């Protein structure tokens, strides 16, 4: 039960709040708002902020673009009620300057309150990363009605597999960069107990990483079912790999078409996937399974982190809002060699990854193509954007096969301010 674990959080959470309302009420009823979040005790510094300001002159990430010396001076002594500081938020971006041609985010949250206590930095980073979405004035919309999707079956001569994923965080527990071992184990316990209530085609079982052989783990990784140990410097610098593989694992249904990763980059990653090009069926299963998981979580006195400005709260600002990434593995041997390919993707608000995901190379001209944005558009809108965009890429590939010319599409409109 939530109330049992809450006592162990008293050193990190507001003991008075827990004592007054109880952990169950806290988990079920805490609505995050700027006027209700107070920072923790100010940090005592030996040197002035100007002496502590990081050298960001060669950095190419959103954090570095927005963190001025003045903002650093105003925020560097603040902390969330958990004690999470600005320097902890930005350390991964300081340590990892980014790629000259690929702009990363460069910062993470340690808890739900991070986005409020350090809003002066997070808000402009969010606006830059999410195509102009202004968290100060805009509200996020959720829509999990899969019946609204149109033209959701791709030509399988090009599309090899389809996948939709999102992340969800358990309210009242710190996010992976900041969580204690006890909190991480509680995330696992709460989630697995809820997942055991799934029935029908969603029913399955949980597999702990610590109980798998290396061969079993590698096979699941090779089949694109399981996450690998975080070895990326941006993840390790953020503290994602601490205590590995304690309290990490994968839950999947019997058909391995509905999966939940536990305690990787986020508390949970919910995934619907299958071979072939039936994105509409993948999204329908995703919506149905996600709604059922949330219902089962709430039955146990917990809930997901959410607010109307930022949508669902996750570790990286790039995943706020829907947290949704709808993607395909697609063969594009001709288009991928065309100099216009990057601009086409940019205008369609799509991103390209290697066959094995982020930081991997494309194998046999197979790319992982997915939506770039997460926030400010609903799940239905983003999946439809991917469907329309992937169909455009397929049309370009067909035209190139016939020796015909292709054109760069008009950019997807940015948000209105």
UniProtKB/Swiss-Prot annotation:
Annotated Phosphagen kinase C-terminal domain residues: 158-400
Reactions this protein catalyses: creatine + ATP = N-phosphocreatine + ADP + H(+)
Subcellular location: Mitochondrion inner membrane
UniProt membrane topology term: Peripheral membrane protein
Entry's Gene Ontology cellular component terms: mitochondrial inner membrane; mitochondrion
EC nos: 2.7.3.2
EC class name: transferase
UniProt xrefs under SUPFAM superfamilies: Glutamine synthetase/guanido kinase (SSF55931), Guanido kinase N-terminal domain (SSF48034)
Domain Phosphagen kinase N-terminal: 44-131
Gene3D superfamilies: ATP:guanido phosphotransferase, N-terminal domain, Glutamine synthetase/guanido kinase, catalytic domain
Pfam family, one: ATP-gua_PtransN
An annotated GO BP: phosphocreatine biosynthetic process
Molecular function terms from GO: ATP binding; creatine kinase activity
Transit peptide, residue positions per record: 1-39
Similarity annotation: Belongs to the ATP:guanido phosphotransferase family.
Reported function: Reversibly catalyzes the transfer of phosphate between ATP and various phosphogens (e.g. creatine phosphate). Creatine kinase isoenzymes play a central role in energy transduction in tissues with large, fluctuating energy demands, such as skeletal muscle, heart, brain and spermatozoa.
Name recorded for this polypeptide: Creatine kinase U-type, mitochondrial
Biological source species: Gallus gallus (Chicken)
